[in-house]
Amino acid sequence: MFPLRSRVTTVGRNAAGARALWRATGTKDNEFGKPIVAIVNSYTQFVPGHVHLKNVGDIVAEAVRAAGGVPKEFNTIAVDDGIAMGHGGMLYSLPSREIIADSVEYMVNAHTADAMVCISNCDKITPGMLNAALRLNIPAVFVSGGPMEAGKAVVADGIAHAPTDLITAITASAKDSVNDDQLLSIEQSACPTCGSCSGMFTANSMNCLTEALGLSLPGNGTTLATHTARRELFETAGKLVVDLCQRYYGEEDESVLPRNIATKKAFINAMALDMAMGGSTNTVLHTLAAAQEGEIDFDLSDIDALSHRIPCLSKVAPNGNYHIEDVHRAGGIPAILGELRRRDLLEKGVHTVLYKEMDSWLDDWDIRGGKATDKAIELFHAAPGGVRTTEPFSQSNRWDSLDTDQARGCIHDVDHAYSADGGLVILRGNLAPDGAVVKAAGVDESIWTFSGPARVVESQEEAVSIILDKQVQPGDVVVIRYEGPAGGPGMQEMLHPTSFLKGAGLGKACALITDGRFSGGTSGLSIGHISPEAAHGGLIGLVENGDTITIDIRNRSLNLDVDDAVIEQRRAAMLEREKPWTPTNRNRPVSKALRAYASMATSADKGAVRQLD
């Protein structure tokens, strides 16, 4: 039997002071000696994906207590990337991942919690809590707040936008053909309920990946926040975490620990899922960071290898017209994994918090596999309610039928894949010797090979300005540099530049490359995570206006077509500058908090984690 971590604060004479304080929080005498479960919540009124989580912690706590545990809740911060987008607030988004991970570690270790339930949802909160879970390596179950319903149809500029989402609104704002009244109509429809934004953006991508990693329950990534079916996920998570405590502390079963669930094989399966579902490029950053926290040998080369053999089976917004609610109707994550399993494209020998082997999990939950339980079939009938609300579990609508069409439905089988290669592709070349990432699922195949003159800017703001001022011409390659983890600092998302290019009708006529990153809502020929970044001496820092840049997605290359001798001349001139590898004409206030992150931040190929040694 392993001793509970919390014993140092609950058992023995020396713990009298701590017990006195525990009593002041409502702990009863008969609860001392039981496992203390941290309910790691992230409720905030700033974020639609978290606005409904205020009372959800109580549901988990009741389940923990009923199962024999002692629940204690605390909150982390949560940044809304959409609200922070396009201004200085985006500098704080990625660094907040590290703050969240640290705050979870601080609270859990300071108060000697024995296990935790992580109630996450949006872009950096799930990755931050995932990093913490793998760092702490105590029993943990993830249950996110759930996705938002897609917006209703809106007709504007002669086009029926059906259904709408956040990206619809941002793109429409850059279209001269959309008048203010039409834009308001789209805006009012785009985000109708609580929950993480309705497409296959970063938040939903990461919540889906927790299923494949084995740390959350089936349906976690796709069951709508508004649906009554989601309540059971929270209840089950509370019961399950106490069972995991018994297995670990009571039976010395180390298989239930996060590092023994989210193994290298599990990470490979998670990124295979991401390739198949056309997930956000940000998942690359976050899985690399999480693997390092768990001391797991998983790096960009593993992701690159997956992109060569995993087909793209789904195109969800912003890459297509489907939304997460449609993925759910088609069987959710078990259905996608099931399609991969049938072609022997998954790693075997993995398990989850709920199942001792993945095969059993998929047998029970893959509605296309022929063995799915009635419970699984019931869950995937959960449909949107179509009513504006910030309340969770507020409707119980059901789809009349499930989407099992493997040729034309939301989730294809391998024979009808959108492409033989995965939805994400790693590019290399002299511009990105350590790698760059493109969401190939969001790029029209007609521009998979692209060559054009560079249009260089040194901030996202400058990029937006030249696009809206119509200074970008068809055929240009917009280069946004010094926006990497250290150079930004904070590695801003470039959603506004890509959305405004699309809104200006240049979505298939231009490319955009950056050492920054992209929102999960980005589509088009948008290449990010260029490593090394400009601030770390990357070649992107030496590109000049008019230089030819060549992109070849099929051959996975990204190159600056300039003679080596010229490049070396530019490098020598850079090193002679008073402040080499810094922007020349950018006036950006940077706080102490951001400078601290920048001083330790690695480039994107390492997950933009802090390097302390």
From Swiss-Prot:
EC number: 4.2.1.9
Family, per entry: Belongs to the IlvD/Edd family.
Keywords on record: 2Fe-2S, Amino-acid biosynthesis, Branched-chain amino acid biosynthesis, Iron, Iron-sulfur, Lyase, Magnesium, Metal-binding
Cofactor(s) needed for function: [2Fe-2S] cluster; Mg(2+)
Pathway: Amino-acid biosynthesis; L-isoleucine biosynthesis; L-isoleucine from 2-oxobutanoate: step 3/4; Amino-acid biosynthesis; L-valine biosynthesis; L-valine from pyruvate: step 3/4
Species lineage: Bacteria, Bacillati, Actinomycetota, Actinomycetes, Mycobacteriales
GO (cellular component) term, any one: cytosol
Residues that, per the record, bind Mg(2+): D81, D123, K124, E493
Keyword Signal attributed: no
Oligomeric form and interacting partners: Homodimer.
Entry-linked InterPro entries: Dihydro-acid_dehy_C, DihydroxyA_deHydtase, DiOHA_6PGluconate_deHydtase_CS, ILV_EDD_C, ILV_EDD_N, IlvD/EDD_N
Biological role stated in the UniProt entry: Functions in the biosynthesis of branched-chain amino acids. Catalyzes the dehydration of (2R,3R)-2,3-dihydroxy-3-methylpentanoate (2,3-dihydroxy-3-methylvalerate) into 2-oxo-3-methylpentanoate (2-oxo-3-methylvalerate) and of (2R)-2,3-dihydroxy-3-methylbutanoate (2,3-dihydroxyisovalerate) into 2-oxo-3-methylbutanoate (2-oxoisovalerate), the penultimate precursor to L-isoleucine and L-valine, respectively.
Active site as annotated: S519
Residues that hold [2Fe-2S] cluster according to the record: C122, C197
One MF annotation (Gene Ontology) recorded for this entry: dihydroxy-acid dehydratase activity
Catalytic activity reported: (2R)-2,3-dihydroxy-3-methylbutanoate = 3-methyl-2-oxobutanoate + H2O; (2R,3R)-2,3-dihydroxy-3-methylpentanoate = (S)-3-methyl-2-oxopentanoate + H2O
Cofactor note: Binds 1 [2Fe-2S] cluster per subunit. This cluster acts as a Lewis acid cofactor.
GO BP: isoleucine biosynthetic process; L-valine biosynthetic process
Pfam families linked: ILV_EDD_C (PF24877), ILVD_EDD_N (PF00920)
Modified residues (N6-carboxylysine): K124
Species of provenance: Corynebacterium diphtheriae (strain ATCC 700971 / NCTC 13129 / Biotype gravis)
Name recorded for this polypeptide: Dihydroxy-acid dehydratase
